[in-house]
């Protein structure tokens, strides 16, 4: 069922230094809410600086949707402490508001209550807000308030030198990109293990449905909650953040050029549906353009190949220039058991799994096979903890017990863990021992644990209780890595950077849009 990686693991055991210098970064989204859990109607707090230009504290879709971004880091504990410091600082600046601790929002009465993120009067700031206007008009605003955690991951050059025989990043960009695409294909095939272990959205507040039709056989409890008894991550289901119109784009992950070509096609091809929506209503802009994707970031994907862009460069142009630099994993729900939405066990598991995805053989995949992999994900997302649950293999009809496949995967991961731990530590091996138990006992998964509490208190009740608990905890903890002075300096510098952008504009917004809007 899983590829035979014994040769690759033997190779890894002989090259332990190849894994020294893994780099990671985390992005965590969270809604600002009032004491009773309703979406905050206030603007992005002045005390946090300018969302457009702040290095660490910004906003995602909505003005109330905070996003925290860590710098790239070589050490997991240091990375998580940095993220916690950003949370501590923010918790002290939010007044009576708090950070919603779940992926799924709860007390939102009407879509029109959701204010789009604002970034000031510069052309780039207005462009970002208009992109969000397009998302709202295309998919609805409610879906965009769902929060998650993104894990950015890259292997060191030493790994690629030993594994693929490259000399440096630029001359070896094709080989390194091929290695990361192999990782991505295996992620599509086996990444359902992430929602199985860490999915934490088995339930939603009934207000989230807001009269929308759904074929899902929801059970309800008396506390305003709809749930599926064996679900792991409704955030990743069709109910959450997915995009039906994108499934026939024919995007594949076999090589850089075909991937980029398909992406570029999507941002240049008009969509009948979005042409019908129109570009403007009177003087009001409705979307950046009428193409299948307004910009490349609109592509919904559980994992993305990335390279840091230069000024004025699109994500795909950056990939063509330098190849894949790192991978962005986008399938993590907010961890409700952590005040910062993610923990070290998850980070270490992702390290292990992503390394395994590079090592394991991964035949090329057609866009049809990519769609087949979605069946396994859907099965795990909607009923992953169902007794006797099975997992398919590619597009064939043969299936195996999820428990068997999960344990076989962990036997491999434990060997990777031994290499990562070396003789100094056992932290990766401990993660394996802790998590593999979830295949014998699904009650140990995040989704089972959180659903148990939600059945007693409702998902809204759990969210309120945790939000208050984490608010007090974070407000009272001292900063460990950052200082108040550094955070105040970044706040002021972000405002200054935004101000300079606004002064620098020479074009009117209409001219800027004609140039950059893809119309």
From Swiss-Prot:
UniProtKB keywords: ATP-binding, Glutathione biosynthesis, Ligase, Nucleotide-binding
Top-level taxon of the source organism: Bacteria
The reaction(s) this protein catalyses: L-cysteine + L-glutamate + ATP = gamma-L-glutamyl-L-cysteine + ADP + phosphate + H(+)
SUPFAM superfamilies from the UniProt entry: Glutamine synthetase/guanido kinase
UniProt-listed Gene3D superfamilies: 3.30.590.20
EC number: 6.3.2.2
Keyword Ligase (UniProt): yes
Gene Ontology MF: a single term: glutamate-cysteine ligase activity
Pfam families noted in UniProt: Glu_cys_ligase
Keyword Disulfide bond: no
Pathway: Sulfur metabolism; glutathione biosynthesis; glutathione from L-cysteine and L-glutamate: step 1/2
BP terms from Gene Ontology: glutathione biosynthetic process
A single Gene Ontology CC term: cytosol
Cysteine pairings via disulfide bonds: none
Family indicated by similarity: Belongs to the glutamate--cysteine ligase type 1 family. Type 1 subfamily.
PANTHER family assigned to the protein according to its UniProt record, in alphabetical order: GLUTAMATE--CYSTEINE LIGASE (PTHR38761:SF1)
Name of the protein described by the UniProt record: Glutamate--cysteine ligase
Name of encoding gene: gshA
């Amino acid at each position: 069922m899983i590829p035979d990686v014994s040769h690759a693991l033997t190779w890894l055991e002989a090259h332990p230094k190849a894994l020294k210098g893994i780099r990671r970064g985390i992005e965590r989204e969270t809604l600002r809410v009032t004491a009773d859990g309703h979406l905050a109607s206030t603007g992005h707090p002045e005390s946090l600086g300018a969302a457009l230009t702040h290095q660490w504290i910004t906003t995602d879709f909505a003005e109330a949707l905070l996003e925290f971004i860590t710098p790239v880091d070589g050490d997991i504990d240091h990375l998580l402490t940095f993220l916690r410091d950003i949370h501590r600082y923010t918790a002290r600046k939010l007044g009576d508001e708090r950070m919603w601790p779940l992926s799924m929002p709860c007390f939102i009465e009407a879509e029109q209550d959701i204010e789009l993120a604002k970034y000031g009067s510069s052309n780039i700031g207005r462009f970002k807000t208009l992109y969000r206007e397009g998302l709202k008009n295309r998919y609805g605003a409610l879906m965009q308030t769902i929060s998650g955690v993104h894990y950015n991951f890259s292997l060191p050059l030493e790994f690629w030198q030993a594994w693929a025989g490259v000399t440096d990043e630029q001359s070896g960009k094709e080989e390194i990109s091929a290695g990361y695409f192999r990782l991505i294909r295996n992620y599509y095939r086996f990444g359902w293990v992430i929602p199985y272990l860490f999915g934490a959205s088995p339930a939603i507040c009934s207000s989230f449905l807001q009269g929308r039709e759904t074929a899902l056989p929801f059970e309800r409890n008396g506390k305003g909650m709809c749930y599926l008894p064996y679900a792991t991550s409704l955030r990743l289901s069709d109910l959450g953040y997915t995009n039906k119109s994108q499934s026939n784009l024919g995007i594949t992950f076999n090589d850089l050029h075909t991937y980029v070509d398909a992406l570029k096609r999507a941002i240049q091809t008009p969509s009948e549906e979005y042409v019908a929506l129109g570009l403007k209503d009177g003087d009001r802009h409705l979307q950046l353009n009428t193409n299948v994707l307004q910009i490349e970031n609109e592509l919904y994907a559980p994992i993305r190949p990335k390279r840091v862009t230069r000024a004025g460069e699109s994500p795909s142009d950056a990939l063509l220039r330098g190849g894949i630099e790192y991978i962005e994993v986008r399938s993590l729900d907010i961890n409700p058991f952590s005040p910062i939405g993610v923990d070290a066990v998850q980070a270490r598991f992702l390290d292990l799994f992503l390394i395994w995805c590079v090592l394991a053989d991964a035949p090329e995949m057609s866009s049809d096979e990519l769609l087949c992999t979605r069946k396994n994900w859907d099965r795990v997302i909607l009923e992953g903890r169902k007794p006797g649950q099975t997992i398919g293999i590619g597009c064939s009809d043969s299936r195996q017990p999820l428990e068997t496949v999960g344990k076989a995967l962990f036997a491999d991961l434990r060997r990777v863990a031994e290499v990562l731990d070396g003789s100094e530590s056992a932290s990766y091996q401990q993660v394996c021992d802790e998590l593999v138990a979830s295949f014998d006992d699904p009650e140990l998964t995040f989704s089972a644990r959180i659903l148990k509490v939600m059945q007693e208190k409702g998902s809204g009740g759990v969210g309120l209780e945790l939000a208050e608990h984490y608010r007090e905890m974070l407000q009272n903890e001292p900063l460990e890595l950052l200082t108040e002075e550094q955070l105040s300096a970044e706040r002021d510098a972000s405002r200054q950077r935004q101000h300079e952008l606004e002064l620098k504009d020479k074009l009117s917004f209409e001219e800027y849009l004609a140039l950059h809007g893809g119309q």
